[in-house]
Amino acid sequence: MKLFKLVNFTKSYDLIWLVITPFVPLLIFYRIIIGKEEILRIKERFGYPSTTRNKKDKLIWLHAASLGEVASATSLAIGFKKANYKGLILITSGTKTSSEFTKNYKDIIHQYHPLDKKKWVNRFISFWEPDILIVMESDIWPNLIFCSKNFGLPVVMASAQISNKSFTRMKNLGFSSTANLFNKVDLILATDKTQSEKFLQLGAKKVLTAKSLKISLPPQKTDQLYIENLRKGISNKIIILAASTREGEESILINSIQKLNKKNHNVFLIIAPRHIQRANKISKINNLNIKIKSKDGLPSSYDNFWISNTYGEMSNLYSLADIVFVGGSLYPFGGHNPSEPCHYKTKIIMGPHSEKCQDIVREMKNSNALIQLNSNSEDEIINSIEKIIINKDFSKSLSIAGSKLAKSWLKIKTNIAYKILKKFPLLVS
């Protein structure tokens, strides 16, 4: 019965791909137009390589969805190197921002992941000949898993987690269907005990509790000359960075900063939106005509707001900021990871929504390294910022607590790498 359901599912999935394949070029063309695909690398989406591979070396394949998951994958890649893995590391992902992120790490090969049609996935695996597939978090594509197993690859899920919404949806598929899928995974390293329990309820058997790899990524290098020039333009204002903001959040934050400045707090807001193509729309909020980096350059002392819309900027901005507001948290977007700014000894605030990073948020709050708001009200945002500005001892304690946590997190990636290498010794033979 289980085998029948699995065969039935794969046949249905293959049939879906048969129907939609003629429309894939239109989808790719549309994504090129809206700036979400690199035209010179389109062939990667169909499993063709855009670079070479030394077949003499072992190759670990880390698959991630977008920027957040690629940060986890990069963290694990560094962990493998620290654990004395000598082979190649390939990261696949689906977004331009994630591809750009990997350029900071010379030992990593990046390719856009093939779309999940069996023919294209098989073509990809046939060329790259990976020794293992490690899926980051929960970016599970059926043919990615099935084809990898057909090629005899071990499959691991690292930093594994499932949102409540996805968990409910998967439970509705039925236990036997999800069990058949997850039992093709040789090892699941969940981010916490709650996540481990979710995978067990879906029929997975080989589950261990580890931690999130996102929090173990070391800070990237900063451009001190650029930071100094940016600071000179802003002058002596208190700098707040709104990091990875989502639609609707910028208006609330801009209103809050305007009210703070009416109270003579002399605050400057840098907005770094999660999706940089929204920069023009953000610049028009409250008819402010906010300067955008890509068009207008750096801010001056006459500005109170500035939009950073270029890639590879966050480490510089975290280093510059006195206070960081973590976006995706004022409305139910799940919240973005608040751990990264801890490495830069800044003060961190986020909104009430943290469904996607509850464990990290809980740890940071328990260590007094994070202010989490109870609502998205402007008054609460203003009060939190004022507390940091006025209470110097409180402000200092926030920074110190975050910095201590960041140092402890750096060990996680190597510990997880050792677990995987111990489980699959062929990777080091």
PLM regions with names:
Residues 1-429:
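Nucleotide-activated sugar donor-binding and catalytic core shared by glycosyltransferases
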